[in-house]
Amino acid sequence: MKLLGIFLVASFAFVLSFGEEMIEGENPLEDQRAELTSCFPVGHECDGDASNCNCCGDDVYCGCGWGRWNCKCKVADQSYAYGICKDKVNCPNRHLWPAKVCKKPCRRNCGG
């Protein structure tokens, strides 16, 4: 029983110390927003692990080759452009490119 009490006290102390670190530490989302004061044009190298907000344009994303190498800002084709646009609506640097309304692609009876 004594061992259980020691375990519970140690666990509680660990949880509290972890919570204080999260409160005192910086918010990674705020850091990302501070970094995004510019964006890359189509064809520029980009970081495949970073946000698509790094590439300028509502339908521009960071696309990579096999194994996350040779990453460049690319224009999404019509089938993916809507999803990319919806993802980029909340980009903190969206004011850097001419924003447009995200439009769903025409699936059938497109009047053509």
Swiss-Prot record:
One GO location term (cellular component): extracellular region
Main location as per UniProt: secreted
UniProt keyword Disulfide bond present: yes
Disulfide bonds: 39-56, 46-62, 53-85, 55-73, 64-71, 91-106, 102-110
Sample GO molecular function, one term: sodium channel regulator activity
Compartment list: Secreted
Organs and tissues of expression: Expressed by the venom gland.
Propeptide: 20-33
Function per UniProt: Reversible inhibitor of neuronal sodium channels (Nav1.2/ SCN2A) that binds in proximity to site 1 and displays increasing affinity as the membrane potential is depolarized. Induces excitatory symptoms and spastic paralysis in mice.
Name under which the protein is recorded: Mu-ctenitoxin-Pn1a
Organism, scientific name: Phoneutria nigriventer (Brazilian armed spider)
